[in-house]
Amino acid sequence: MSDQLIIYGVPFSQPVRAVLWLMLYKQKPFELAMINPGSSSEGGSRHPDFLAKFPTGTIPSIEDKETGFVLSESHAIMCYLCNKFDWDDLYPKNHEQRAKVDSYLHLHHRNVREASIGLVAPKVRKDLN
């Protein structure tokens, strides 16, 4: 199988790493397209070319080269990949078990990621202040 999935982002980003780790754990080939978060210059997530494909301008984002399907947001991407490739060991088909996974994903996004971004981003990316 060729690298039919493109993951847009930078490994420095925790949400990007989560998607990369999933693909590496499952030994699925992919292409990594380096995108500078928050930048409006070429190769940045706020550049018009990137925004034309991914209107939210966020990373990670993915593109399925075979179907043209695009998606952003790490948790949505991971759920999509688990569904697409039937990775039931990570994202169960059982509704109650899946709800527990979803509950953690939402907790993580709302509480952990949102709280830490305000602390980390200004230190790492002075241009985003």
Please name every model-derived segment:
Residues 1-128:
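GST-like domain detector, emphasizing the conserved glutathione-binding G-site
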